[in-house]
Design a protein with these regions (language model features):
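Small cysteine-rich, disulfide-bonded extracellular modules of the LU/uPAR three-finger superfamily
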Residues: 1-108, 115-149
């Protein structure tokens, strides 16, 4: 019997830097592909729907579940990906976004979206708190890998 299945996994690397560019903190965290994200991936096989284009951070602490369609407590507005992103190498897609002075607080969640507001969320994760001041920058590099399970 043939058993076909596809596995999608994501990992994000977070780097927090101070005003002088010194690294204050780094994290590596797994994420959850949400239901809307799985549907988005399937739709891309037959349509030319919108591309993932934005990332958001927030202060939500509830663990991600497949039915999530937004962050629990988004900080500020979603930002577009850094120049040159996303990139693709084989079955790996990497997204990167930088959050500057307009984003402060105790950051505990992040997500990838296909629009500046509303739209489809691809994935969401929560993590241990990171205190971000107005002079700090936070860069999140998020790699999504699709493989045969």
């Amino acid at each position: 019997m043939i058993n076909d299945s596809i596995k999608v996994k994501g990992n994000l690397d977070i780097v927090l830097k101070d005003a002088d560019g010194n690294v204050k903190e780094t994290r590596s965290v797994r994420n959850l592909l949400v239901d809307d994200g799985a549907e988005y991936i399937a739709s891309r096989m037959i349509t030319n729907s919108g591309l993932m284009s934005h990332m958001a951070i927030g202060e939500g602490t509830t663990s991600p579940v497949a039915g999530n369609d937004a962050l629990e407590n988004q900080d500020g507005t979603r930002v577009t990906f850094d120049n040159g992103f996303p990139t693709r190498s084989g079955a790996e897609i990497t997204y990167s976004a930088t959050f500057g002075s307009g984003y402060t607080g105790t950051i505990t969640e992040s997500g990838i979206f296909d629009a500046a507001t509303n739209g489809t969320m691809l994935c969401r994760t929560t993590f241990n708190p990171i205190s971000k001041s107005s002079v700090d920058t936070m860069q999140i590099s998020w790699t999504v890998t699709i493989s045969a399970a």
